[in-house]
Amino acid sequence: MTKNDITRGLIDFAVSQCLKNIKEDPYRSIRRLADLGRQFAKGRFQEELFSLFQRLLLNEDGPYYETLKQLVSSVDTDSLKTLGINIGYNSWTCGASRLRQITAEKDYPHWLAEISLSPESSASQLKEQLSAALKNGTYAFRLHMPAQSITTDTRQLGLIREFPDCSFFLDFMDTDCTYSDDLLELTCSCDNLAFLVPFGSLQSRQLVDLLNARQRIYGVCRTYDNTNAAERISDSQISEMLSWGSPLLFFLAAADTTQDNRLLVDNAILDARLHQTYPALLIHL
């Protein structure tokens, strides 16, 4: 057993206790989670991030307490704990340390790797990609579903269980949001998996309803371009996204979006976080 294994075990126990007590004493339990992150942070990025969390949580009247309480009450506890530790410790701490070590050796890889689940790719090819990224310190993966998502090879998605220390984000953004019963049951049984669902269509909303019923973690995502960047971050459109039931809201720029419009959205999201404008965590992909 390695030092990291022991540390993860301690974190697992502490997080379990916090999640157990969060309904009775949300303020203390949620602050304890932020304190844990700061305590085990190894790099400057992690220390600054969890220090920011601690400062934001000083405002007991802010919306983030309700946001986290909603997550705990609506999402399966094992999934919430697994994804939280895999991202906060494995990706942002252990993985980040490895990524810093190899910076001088090759181009700096991102902590979140993007992989397309094309029908032409085999499960063995995907396993090789995941294993190679893991060696470099990447523990989080955004898996892009094919346009007709129902055609996804379940053998590929079955690999998620073979990498329990990793986090996976199943991206439906470029799909028709169709699915088979086998696909849904397989993905909903993986505690280290979250879903990215596009806002807007009836098929998307039906998928969200099924994920809610199964207490799965998902984020609602909206794309923007040069014609609607300001509109996408307006109070009215963010309220529309919140009506779908997830406090995790993602914003994705179209490929030809200018840097000025990307910065517009980026700054608006940062401002909303710091001023705790919404009962949600806004994330710019």
Describe each model-derived feature in a short phrase.
Residues 41-116, 139:
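N-terminal [4Fe-4S]-dependent radical SAM core
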Residues 102, 128-136, 158-159, 185-186, ...:
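A generic secondary-structure signal
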Residues 158-159, 165-175, 242-243, 265-269, ...:
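Compact recognition or signaling/catalytic modules
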